[in-house]
Swiss-Prot record:
GO CC annotations on file: chloroplast
Annotated localization: Plastid, Chloroplast
MF terms (GO), sorted A to Z: ATP binding; tRNA(Ile)-lysidine synthase activity
The keyword Nucleotide-binding appears for this protein: yes
Keyword flag Glycoprotein: no
UniProt keyword terms in alphabetical order: ATP-binding, Chloroplast, Ligase, Nucleotide-binding, Plastid, tRNA processing
Catalytic activity: cytidine(34) in tRNA(Ile2) + L-lysine + ATP = lysidine(34) in tRNA(Ile2) + AMP + diphosphate + H(+)
Role of this protein: Ligates lysine onto the cytidine present at position 34 of the AUA codon-specific tRNA(Ile) that contains the anticodon CAU, in an ATP-dependent manner. Cytidine is converted to lysidine, thus changing the amino acid specificity of the tRNA from methionine to isoleucine.
Protein name: tRNA(Ile)-lysidine synthase, chloroplastic
PANTHER family: TRNA(ILE)-LYSIDINE SYNTHASE-RELATED
Xref: NCBIfam families: lysidine_TilS_N (TIGR02432)
Entry EC no(s): 6.3.4.19
Top-level class of the enzyme under EC nomenclature: ligase
Length: 420
């Protein structure tokens, strides 16, 4: 018999918090065993992985669908124990005629739970999923910064993780791409918000809604503020959450686009995965999710090695030549590490200088130009040549982000803007 595993924190200084904890504890034990297991599993995971902490200000991204509504209710049940300050953010892409009703539904949930709500409406229709995702994350990030939330949580599940693994595998992603849905990652600015008036950008639905006071607040990006994206439900399946909705009688807003099989991810969900379960492995979801978790932990380890080696191999040399940046890399050190680490080092370096995610092709171009030498190039490196002569034999590599990387004598990298 489990003893109260959920409410492991106590607050003897505040009788009000203690009362809330006791009340919440009783309500939990009145729920069905399956519900308690999910709460217990999530609570233990938060402790083990240390992805959320007591007394944090947490901003929950809520669409109104099953996964985000379950996440909201779970965190709401745990908030008195962890002493969290919760906030809800909802973004309306105006993809459907009833999207305003969906936003109102979320606002009523926030009012009933007495949680601050931040709602945003796009000013232009964006039909591209990637652009819409970038707009959504950028806006949520600004809300978090302006209202002092340290983390953003989303309702991605183990099922989403498996579908993303298959999707990225089909697209030919590397190991990092295969485990792209991670427990925690830093949310960087994507600069995708088109600035409009506050009235156009934000729609208010209830007294619990807060919004930006002026345009400058939305434009302002506080320096040295790290916002992290947390996905606490990656070990909970979509089916488990479906049972939770039924047991708790939660009101959710179904997304009809999830049934559209013209979308690749939906074909994976509704056609490919059921086929794999029936004809290959009935627990294929669990197997693939376990593989993803193994890749995630191994990637963290390899990335830490790659960044350490890069910090030892990299130095900047200022150059007066057209405001270009000259970078000196210790190519001998890079050649001494395994190929997998070489590629990770160059991938991380190129991502930083281009402010985007470079492809395997670009990584290999730079690696071959910098690290693969011949006898003639070795002899050439020993020759005494001035810098002007070396510029004549440079190799230019065109990168994303309108950057050109010039490799000089396999010793220097010159980074400049592509003005064409």
């Amino acid at each position: 018999m489990l003893t109260n595993p959920i409410f492991y924190l106590t607050n003897s200084n505040t009788s009000k918090a203690s009362t809330h904890s006791n009340t919440n504890s009783k309500s939990l034990f009145n729920t069905k065993r399956e519900d308690l297991q999910i709460l217990y599993k999530l609570n233990q995971l938060l402790i083990e992985k240390s992805i959320l902490h007591p007394y944090q200000r947490i901003l929950i991204a809520v669409s109104g669908g099953q996964d985000s509504i379950c996440l909201l209710n779970i965190l709401n049940k745990l908030r008195s124990t962890w002493h969290w300050k919760l906030g809800i953010v909802h973004c309306d892409h105006k993809w459907y005629l009833d999207s305003a009703l969906q936003a109102i539904h979320v606002s009523r949930l926030a009012a009933n739970m007495q949680i601050d709500l931040y709602q945003a409406l796009t000013t232009q229709s964006v039909n591209n999923e990637q652009l819409a995702r970038n707009w959504r994350y950028e806006l949520i990030r600004h809300v978090a910064i302006c209202h002092n939330f340290s983390v953003i949580v989303t309702g991605h599940t183990a099922s989403d993780r498996v579908e993303t693994l298959i999707y990225n595998l089909i697209r030919g992603s590397g190991i990092s791409g295969l485990q792209s849905i991670s427990w925690k990652r830093k949310l960087n600015s994507m600069l995708t918000i088109r600035m409009r008036s506050v009235e156009e950008q934000i729609i208010l639905y209830s007294k619990h809604v807060k919004c930006y006071q002026n345009r400058e607040n939305l434009l302002e990006d506080k320096k040295n503020v790290d916002i992290y994206l947390i996905r606490p439900l990656l070990n909970v399946s979509r089916m488990e959450l479906k049972h939770l909705v039924q047991n708790w009688k939660l009101s959710i807003w179904s997304d009809c686009s999830n049934q559209n099989i013209s979308i690749c991810r939906n074909r994976i969900r509704h056609q490919l995965l059921p086929y794999l379960r029936q004809y290959f492995h009935p627990k294929i979801d669990y197997v693939l999710n376990s593989c993803t978790e193994v890749m995630y932990t191994e990637t963290l380890y390899l990335d830490s090695i790659a960044r350490y080696v890069l910090s030892k191999a990299l130095s900047f040399i200022s150059m007066p030549l057209n405001d270009q940046t000259c970078v000196k890399l210790d190519f001998e050190l890079l050649r001494a590490v395994p190929l997998a680490i070489q590629r990770r080092i160059l991938k991380y370096f190129l991502d930083v200088i281009t402010h985007t995610s470079v492809s395997f092709k670009h990584v290999e171009q730079v690696r071959i130009a910098c690290l693969i030498t011949t006898n003639s190039s070795n002899q050439f490196a020993k020759d005494s040549m001035n810098f002007t002569d070396q510029l004549l034999i440079n190799r230019s590599i065109y990168l994303p982000g309108k950057k050109i990387l010039q490799v000089i004598n396999a010793r220097f990298l010159i980074i400049c803007n592509n003005i064409t």
